[in-house]
Curated annotation (Swiss-Prot):
Alphabetized UniProt keyword annotations: Allosteric enzyme, Cytoplasm, Hydrolase, Metal-binding, Protease, Sodium, Threonine protease
GO-annotated molecular function: metal ion binding; threonine-type endopeptidase activity
Name of encoding gene: hslV
GO cellular component: HslUV protease complex; proteasome core complex
Keyword Translocase: no
Designated name of the protein: ATP-dependent protease subunit HslV
Source organism: Thermosipho melanesiensis (strain DSM 12029 / CIP 104789 / BI429)
Annotated catalysed reactions: ATP-dependent cleavage of peptide bonds with broad specificity
Compartments (UniProt record): Cytoplasm
């Protein structure tokens, strides 16, 4: 059986950075849990981080990312690149199945196990199975409304939760 994914969304607008995730954990065709916390603050509250994929793998990556963040003196870009390099080259890390979404006041990055560190070209990023729906909704809301970052993030993931069967409407919100 396969663990199915989730949806995590990050929206930047004005001086606000908001990350929201759903709470559903799905194994095969069964919902195992509906209130998992998939986003958190790290780096003394200066960084938001969320994950999609295997929970145990993501926790290991959270810990590694936080160590890299401390090692590089709070430089999010360098921390993301160094984690991606380790993730790609280390035999044990290479087997971890998760994606990380990290953001601070300046940057947002998606970090993958294949070595990618992707900075979105606009002010919204998303990972997980509901990501395409959340991105589409978020881009439209950013472009055509005056909603806040928090309102856009929540509406984007709410729309994704109505379409993606691996995403529920039990949201966790973190803000910078």
């Amino acid at each position: 059986m396969k663990w199915r994914s989730t949806t995590v969304v990050c929206v930047r607008k004005n001086d606000s950075v908001v990350m929201v995730s759903d709470g559903q954990v799905t194994y095969g065709n069964t919902i195992m849990k509906g209130n998992a916390k998939k986003v958190r603050k790290m780096g003394e509250g200066n960084v938001l981080a969320g994950f999609a994929g295997s929970v145990a793998d993501a926790m290991a990556l959270f810990d590694r990312f936080e160590a890299k963040y401390r090692e590089w003196g709070g430089n999010l870009l360098k921390s993301a690149v160094e984690l991606a390099k380790d993730w790609r080259t280390d035999r044990v890390l290479r087997r971890l199945e998760a994606l990380l979404l990290v953001a601070d006041k300046k940057y947002t990055f998606i970090i993958s196990g294949t070595g990618e560190v992707i900075q979105p070209e606009d002010d919204i990023a998303s990972i997980g199975s509901g990501s395409p729906y959340a991105i589409a909704a978020g881009r439209a809301l950013l472009k055509h409304t005056n909603l806040s970052a928090k309102e856009i993030a929540l509406e984007s993931i709410r729309i994704a939760s109505e379409i993606c069967i691996y995403t529920n409407d039990n949201f966790t919100i973190e803000e910078l």
